[in-house]
């Protein structure tokens, strides 16, 4: 099991792989209760880490360069259901 506190500098992708591994182990259903709780706690920490990294990237993407070189808020346009 990975020590999340020691891996605060792990990448988003590494954290997601850790989450996938934990989910896989828990889905097997052959995990003692105490170990399942530890996996759950680690998964929650990894999930929080991923969420924080995504929020940071979202803030970075909130500003993009306009044609005149000024920073402007970035807005995502939702796809219409008919466009799919």
Swiss-Prot record:
Can you state which reaction this protein catalyses? Exonucleolytic cleavage in either 5'- to 3'- or 3'- to 5'-direction to yield nucleoside 5'-phosphates
* Keywords (A to Z) from UniProt: Cytoplasm, Exonuclease, Hydrolase, Nuclease
Looking at the keywords, is Nuclease present?
A: yes
Using the UniProt record, give the first listed, main subcellular location: cytoplasm
Look up the record and report any one GO term of the cellular component aspect.
cytosol
Which InterPro entries does the record cross-reference, listed alphabetically? Exonuc_VII_S (IPR003761), Exonuc_VII_ssu_sf (IPR037004)
Indicate whether Transmembrane helix appears among the record's keywords: no
Please explain the role this protein plays, according to its UniProt record: Bidirectionally degrades single-stranded DNA into large acid-insoluble oligonucleotides, which are then degraded further into small acid-soluble oligonucleotides.
Q: NCBIfam families recorded for this chain? A: PRK14063.1, xseB
- Say which family it is in: Belongs to the XseB family.
Query: What's the protein here called?
Result: Exodeoxyribonuclease 7 small subunit
